[in-house]
Amino acid sequence: MNVIEKLATYEDQISPGVSACVGCNVELTLRTCMKVLGPNTIFAVPPGCMGGVGVVGWDKESGAKTPVFFPLLDNVASMLAGIKMHYERIGRKVNVVAFAGDGASVDAGMQCLSGAAERGDKIIYICYDNEGYMNTGYQRSGSTTKGAWTSTTPVINGHGGKKQNKKDFPMIMAMHDVPYMATMSPAYIPDMVRKLEKAMAVDNGLAEPYISRL
């Protein structure tokens, strides 16, 4: 049985109908990640594209079968660290996973993510990088490519788009000496599945699968 055939046997952890933009490959990525990580998982999805498509839920309704927390944009990793410590204290092994965009990871949440990485908090932190604050009108982020047009870095009247280089987020996290750092893409689902399985096997610190350039 190949990886795709094996993935097809996993239970889908999110409903078929969510309000993501048509053709959104972040939705495909989220579905794949939730399938592989399975029902014994607690997710934190901060404000962003995936937090607003029905994953988190409103009015006691959610598109997800697993518990999903809705943290602030800047405290995702530290909140998950506390949740993981609680489950370790009661002797229960649970996957504790962040699914956060580049705004919550590369910018607003970098401080607490850096702290979690340095402490060796046993969480899985998945960053989906769509290179901007997409669900609020496409403002530039620290992950936006140099020269790119966004609503806050226009290409008009002598302004040539974003002036700063894109932050090398995978390298920044690797320099924290995390036990596992990987880049992956929904264009290569078998590779993504294998890397998620490796992240789940890490038990001595933070695992960082980074989904690049969505």
Regions found by a protein language model. Name each.
Residues 2-125, 138, 143-149, 162, ...:
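Cofactor-binding active-site loop characterized by glycine-rich and histidine/acidic residues
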Residues 92-96, 107-123, 128, 132-214:
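Glycine-rich ThDP/TPP pyrophosphate-binding loop and its adjacent helix/strand module
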